[in-house]
Curated annotation (Swiss-Prot):
GO molecular function: cytoskeletal motor activity; structural molecule activity
InterPro entries assigned to the protein according to its UniProt record, in alphabetical order: FliE
The protein, known as: Flagellar hook-basal body complex protein FliE
Keyword entries, A-Z: Bacterial flagellum
GO CC term (a single one): bacterial-type flagellum basal body
Example GO biological process: bacterial-type flagellum-dependent cell motility
PANTHER family from the UniProt entry: FLAGELLAR HOOK-BASAL BODY COMPLEX PROTEIN FLIE (PTHR34653:SF1), PTHR34653
Highest taxon of source: Bacteria
Subcellular location as annotated: Bacterial flagellum basal body
Family in the record: Belongs to the FliE family.
Length: 98
């Protein structure tokens, strides 16, 4: 019967936890990148639609332009609020004494 060293098991568990934390942070970063891409896409779409409406091109109504502008505005406001929460959490963590 083979008895495995307790310290060896403990170290492997810690490495597994670090790997899980790394994967979670990568998922968070990927999510932020995707969200910022969507915000950029909304803003570009709103800009293009408003330019088409100003140039009186067919197929673009004022309703569509206003809806796209509001989507763009709301998504940007949400991004700013998320950024503020992240900065606030970072500052709170950095102000804690160890």
């Amino acid at each position: 019967m083979f008895i495995e060293n307790i310290n060896h098991q403990n170290i492997n568990t810690k490495f597994n936890l670090l790997d899980a934390q790394k994967k979670d942070s990568e998922n968070f970063i990927d999510y932020i990148k995707i969200a910022l891409g969507e915000i950029s896409k909304n803003q570009n779409h709103a800009k293009i639609d408003s330019e088409k409406f100003i140039l009186n091109q067919s197929g673009i109504s004022l309703n569509d332009v206003m809806i796209n502008l509001e989507k763009s505005s709301i998504s940007m406001q949400l991004a700013v609020q998320i950024r503020n929460k992240i900065v606030s959490a970072y500052q709170e963590i950095m102000s804690q004494q160890i």
